[in-house]
Swiss-Prot record:
One GO cellular component term: IkappaB kinase complex
Organism encoding this protein: Rattus norvegicus
Keywords: Coiled coil, Metal-binding, Transferase, Ubl conjugation pathway, Zinc, Zinc-finger
Protein name, UniProt field: E3 ubiquitin ligase TRIM40
Pfam family, any one: zf-C3HC4
Length: 247
């Protein structure tokens, strides 16, 4: 373990790497949160918690409120995948959790970060496929628009018949040619909606993977549920099956 001095104040004395999620002990020494958690796990066996640098007594509360069980006021050490709750040692003794699968905090963060990254890579590929399909539909619609323009006059009344939502989503000249939007216009509009929603979902997955810690494990689990293939079938249900090639 490296001694603390002015030249390495941004270095964790335990892992010797730049501080990640830095936390300060009661004696004001800084550590990576996960490094300090692992230290406390080992120290809890002896029942004596102390600073790894100066050996002064150290409280579990320095980890932060999100790492303390609000029921028993003890440090959380496991994440229950069934209930999606952070558990302390006393929680683990409850009959409610004995049949559940629990991961250590460190393993849970690693496990869910990998799942989030894997899901975001998959959906980003799907998003690219969807954007290409949307571009194809737009080209077809542009070709049809030229044909409509040579046969159908544009009237002021026909312009007023278009909904405000469609006017925002598509170029106005595509919607001005007839009283009811053609099937091709609806397809492009639906693709645009799907692309927007899927883009938001991919961004959320990527951001969650980067910022994941113990306090957001439940949110990560919920996000993985929302981005499952079964849920995405509902998101993309308005895209014609013949045109949708998403896996």
């Amino acid at each position: 373990m490296v001694p603390l001095d002015k030249d390495n104040q941004d270095i964790c004395p335990i892992c010797l790497d730049p501080l990640k999620e830095a936390v300060s002990t009661d004696c004001r020494h800084l550590f990576c949160r996960m490094c300090l958690i692992r230290h406390m796990d080992k120290a809890s066996v002896s029942g004596v918690l102390s600073c790894p640098v100066c050996r002064k007594p150290c409280s579990e509360t320095v980890l932060g409120d999100n790492y303390i069980c609000h029921t028993h006021q003890k440090r959380v050490c496991r994440f229950c995948e069934s209930s999606r709750h952070l558990l302390c040692e006393e929680c683990l003794q409850s009959p409610e959790h004995r049949a559940h699968t629990e991961l250590s905090i460190e393993n849970a963060i690693s496990h869910y970060k990998e799942r989030l990254n894997r899901r975001s890579r998959k959906l980003r590929k799907d998003l690219g496929d969807l954007q290409r399909l949307k571009a194809q539909e737009e080209k077809m619609l542009q070709a049809l628009q030229v044909d409509w323009g040579s046969h159908r006059p544009r009237t002021e009344q026909q312009n007023q018949d278009q909904t405000e939502l469609q006017q925002k989503a598509l170029p106005r000249h595509w919607l001005d040619q007839r009283e009811d939007p053609p099937e091709e216009v609806a397809k492009v509009f639906n693709f645009s909606e799907a692309v927007t929603q899927l883009s938001i979902l991919v961004s959320s997955l990527e951001r969650m993977a980067k910022e994941l810690d113990a306090s957001t494990l439940k949110d990560a689990s919920d996000l993985l549920d929302r981005s499952s293939q079964q849920k995405l079938e509902g998101l993309l249900s308005h895209v014609p099956p013949a045109n949708s090639k998403l896996s």
